[in-house]
Regions:
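Short glycine- and Lys/Arg-enriched binding-loop motifs that mark or flank ligand-binding interfaces
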Residues: 1, 13, 21, 95, ...
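Conserved small/polar residues in nucleotide/adenosyl-binding loops
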Residues: 3-12, 209-216
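Terminal low-complexity tails and localization/encapsulation signals of metabolic enzymes
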Residues: 6-7, 11-41, 74, 78, ...
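Glycine-rich loop-to-alpha-helix module at the N-terminal edge of alpha/beta enzyme cores
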Residues: 37-127, 137
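Rossmann-like NAD(P) dinucleotide-binding subdomain of oxidoreductase/dehydrogenase enzymes
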Residues: 128-212
Length: 218
């Protein structure tokens, strides 16, 4: 792992609740565009690693979808609070990785935390319906269930807001999520995934991997 300051490091893949190296052992350089300094080396996942992430996410889905909406809401709110606590670290990542001015990066952190907080409340409002039937002795009940594993592909220009929008919405609905950031901005998304782990998201409910787009689609 390459250290970037005292609190920051480039991590590896996150599968089944653990940070692990890519099976190929390959890495790529994460570079500061302003100074061309190497910030660290991120693990480059293989298609086989993605299959492992999918398997873990399927297992995580079975656990997470059975977690009550109120408990999911509590965890999402904790993530929002933790993001605000770590505002400086998250903002610094964006400034180093993609050159966003620090004040703008801090604003993005606040916006991303607000998204988690919003979805924490929406989790409690996943209501079903009772519909009148055309038969006198029948009622129609509608229940909403998680659809499965979410693939969250995150662009480089707003890495924290857009990853938060996808991760928090998927988790709120009871789905598990595999997040893949742009290769330019892995660090800030890694930090968000680590916050999810710290705040009680169970293994497999959130996974993280790097892979180039043409490899991901195959």
């Amino acid at each position: 792992r390459g250290l970037v300051g005292s609190e920051m490091c480039i991590r590896d893949r996150f599968i089944d609740g653990k940070w692990i190296k890519a099976s190929s052992g390959e890495t790529y350089e994460v570079i500061n565009p302003a100074s061309e300094e190497i910030l660290g080396h991120a693990s480059k996942a293989s298609p086989e690693d993605v299959e492992k992430a999918l398997k873990s996410a399927q297992q995580g889905l079975e656990v997470w979808k059975k977690t009550t909406p109120w408990q999911r809401s509590y965890i999402l709110r904790r993530i929002a609070d933790k993001m605000r606590e770590k505002q400086d670290v998250l903002a610094k990542w964006m400034t180093l990785e993609m050159g966003k001015p620090l004040n703008e990066a801090k604003g993005e952190v606040n916006g991303a935390a607000d998204i988690f907080e919003w979805n924490a409340e929406e989790t409690k409002r996943i209501y079903g319906q009772t519909v009148e039937s055309r038969f006198e002795d029948t009622r129609v009940h509608v229940y909403y269930q998680p659809v499965g594993v979410v693939a969250a592909l995150v662009p480089w220009n707003f890495p924290l807001v857009l990853s938060s929008r996808k991760i928090s919405t998927g988790l709120a609905a009871g789905c598990s999520v595999i997040v893949k950031p742009d290769i330019i901005t892995p660090g800030v998304v890694m930090e968000l995934v680590e916050i999810c782990r710290e705040c009680g998201v169970p293994p497999g409910a959130v996974s993280y991997t790097h892979l180039r787009a043409h490899e991901t689609s195959t």
